[in-house]
Amino acid sequence: METLAQHRHARSSAQKVRLVADLIRGKKVSQALDILTYTNKKAAVLVKKVLESAIANAEHNDGADIDDLKVAKIFVDEGPSMKRIMPRAKGRADRILKRTSHITVVVSDR
């Protein structure tokens, strides 16, 4: 049984989150949680919360056994960018893009 959890509009760029997502794709959830716990990146905290949510969803909604679960799919899509202005010298201004991402984790007992 596949169970899904999402974090939409996560305040980190998709490029940065994908580095962490690639570490746990296809792993057992216990091993994936250990990897995320000791990964020293902001994105690891975001992905870990989504993974824990997917595990809880599988246990509560589908009655799955946590020991059998693995990360079947994990993907990160770009979310909307917040546009900000940064003043520069001589009356100019630069545009700053504060990027967001949508993190999706699918756990499965197969």
Curated annotation (Swiss-Prot):
GO terms for biological process: translation. SUPFAM superfamilies: Ribosomal protein L22. GO terms for cellular component: cytosolic large ribosomal subunit. The keyword Heme does not apply. Keywords: Ribonucleoprotein, Ribosomal protein, RNA-binding, rRNA-binding. The keyword Ribonucleoprotein applies. One of its GO terms (molecular function) is structural constituent of ribosome. Part of the 50S ribosomal subunit. This protein binds specifically to 23S rRNA; its binding is stimulated by other ribosomal proteins, e.g. L4, L17, and L20. It is important during the early stages of 50S assembly. It makes multiple contacts with different domains of the 23S rRNA in the assembled 50S subunit and ribosome. The globular domain of the protein is located near the polypeptide exit tunnel on the outside of the subunit, while an extended beta-hairpin is found that lines the wall of the exit tunnel in the center of the 70S ribosome. Belongs to the universal ribosomal protein uL22 family. This is Large ribosomal subunit protein uL22. The lineage of its organism: Bacteria, Pseudomonadati, Pseudomonadota, Gammaproteobacteria, Enterobacterales. The gene is rplV.
